[in-house]
Every structure is written in structure tokens, then in C-alpha cells.
Amino acid sequence: MIRKVKKEIRVIGFDDGTFKFKSRGDKVILVGVIMKGSSDVVGIVTRWITIDGLDVTDAIIDAINSSRFKDLRVVLLKGITYAGFNIVDVSRVFKETGLPVIVVVRKKPDIGAMESALRKHFDDYEVRIKLLRSAGKLVELIPGKLYYQAIGISYDKAAEVIQVTSRNSMVPEALRLAHMIASAVMCGESKKD
């Protein structure tokens, strides 16, 4: 439990690399950047996940639990869908790592449209829709620009963590860097946040 959000709180932020939408079953990189607050990169972990698979949750849990970074305090996710519709079970990440999870998104997701796409394209759509719905309440942090969900941490503390770990953009620095690194691995150069 986090009582006070310190300026140099240790966080790990995950994002995936870019991919072609018609490449279901292929692999894409998942990058986790470990930081002290918003300034010091402490380390990086990587895993490969399946486009439109169901392995991102296991990859995140393994990356955290098998790493040498034992002083992590919070997991930051850039959304809950990775590699297409490879959806994170945020409750399971919280339970199996013992770390609170904060999901950060810049655009408010259209859950109805996502559920419709899942029903249309996936035989296991019920499992995926359940994961979407179990991610927690979406809260607006910066009106029209930044939203978040929190599991295992109060929404007030989660907002503090987001603010303390952000530096060069609205999103936490660990997520910004994870995005840049993952897209550079997949495309040869980083993509705009």
C-alpha cells in the first residue's frame, strides 16, 4: 500500500511496438521501462507478445516477477489493449505482482465500439469483453486529454503518481519512453507519442 507518493517512486511502465493490423498471430515487442519518478531510468525489460493473442498478462507478470527490480511500487500501463486486442487482466497483474496498477490513456476509449469489434472478429469475445469491463472505472484527469483507471490504489493516489512521474508530456515518463523504445525496435526508429 502506498501511503505517500514520493518524488522518486519506482515505477514500471509498459507499452508495445507498432505492427500491421493484418498480422494476427505474429509477435510484437512489449517494453517495460523502470524509473525513479520522472527523471532516472533504472532499467528496461522486454517480452514478445502475440498480436490479438491472450498472452500480455502473463508477459507483464513474468517481466516484473522475474526481474532483478524488487523495489517497484506501481505498474503503469498505456491502455489495456496491446498488440491489437491482446487485453491485460489488470486485476491478475495486481494480485500476482502485489503492485497497484494504473492504466493511462490519452483518448477516452469507445468501449461499445471495442465490444462490437470483439464480437465480430473473435470466437472468444466473451473472455475479452470481460477483461475490458473488469479494468476499473475510467476517470478523467485532464479534461478531454488524459484518463486513468486504478486497481489496488486509490484514485487520488493514482492521480498523484501520474503527476509525479510525468515530465515531458501528460503521460508518465516511463510510458512515454516505453512507447519510443518499442516502436524503435519494431520500425527502426521511434514514433511520435
Swiss-Prot record:
InterPro entries: Endo_dU (IPR002802). Transmembrane segments: none annotated. It comes from the Archaea. HAMAP family: UPF0215. Belongs to the UPF0215 family. This is UPF0215 protein PH0071. It comes from Pyrococcus horikoshii (strain ATCC 700860 / DSM 12428 / JCM 9974 / NBRC 100139 / OT-3).
